[in-house]
């Protein structure tokens, strides 16, 4: 090379498009009642989310253990933080995230690390959620489910979401339900 200049490599013809919004990646928060289909949706899409149920299973050998919520969620946030520090481009959180207050710490953490935040809202009637829960052998008492349904608030862009996807169920002929997107 004369003069120390380095020729720039040719740009490949099929270079990936640059995202319109510069950032490190995305955090997707699932939002919905127990039994609304959050975990099933992730399984169907072959996605392995950070899951409060899975963490309870790992820590306490019981996905239904509810006595140590602060411990579960502080560990779950630490796991997400580790993924953000490692610059993992896609991050999914599988938890109920019922209220703006519940979602705030996730959104703040993601934004602090320069990540985009999207909501995946499972808008499913409480009766269907309770029926599904009974079928899978996990029983959240009806009064607790109804209390949770009363707390559930749909996500809004004002919370900091850049995109909100709503997942609903559609009725089949025999009254059975299946998820729809």
Identify the function of each model-found stretch:
Residues 39-89, 128-130:
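Conserved substrate/cofactor phosphate-moiety recognition/catalytic segment
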Residues 1-16:
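Long, low-complexity intrinsically disordered regions
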Residues 35, 54-56, 97:
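Short, glycine/acidic-enriched loop or turn micro-motifs at the edges of active sites
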Residues 12-14, 19-20, 24-31, 36, ...:
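Conserved GTP-binding G-domain of TRAFAC-class P-loop NTPases and closely related GTPase folds
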């Amino acid at each position: 090379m004369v003069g120390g200049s380095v020729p720039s490599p040719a740009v490949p013809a099929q270079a990936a498009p640059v995202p319109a919004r510069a950032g490190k990646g995305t955090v997707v928060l699932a939002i919905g009642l127990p039994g609304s289909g959050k975990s099933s949706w992730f399984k169907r899409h072959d996605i392995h989310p950070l899951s409060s149920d899975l963490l309870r299973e790992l820590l306490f050998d019981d996905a239904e253990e509810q006595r140590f919520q602060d411990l579960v969620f502080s560990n779950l946030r630490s796991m997400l933080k580790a993924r953000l520090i490692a610059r993992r481009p896609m991050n999914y959180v599988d938890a109920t995230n019922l209220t703006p207050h519940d979602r705030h710490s996730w959104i703040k953490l993601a934004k602090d690390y320069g990540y985009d935040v999207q909501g995946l809202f499972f808008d499913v009637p409480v009766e269907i959620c309770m029926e599904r829960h009974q079928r899978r052998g996990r029983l959240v008492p009806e009064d607790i489910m109804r209390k949770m349904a009363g707390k559930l608030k749909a996500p809004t862009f004002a919370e900091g979401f850049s995109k909100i996807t709503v997942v609903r169920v559609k009725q089949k002929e025999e009254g059975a339900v299946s998820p729809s997107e």
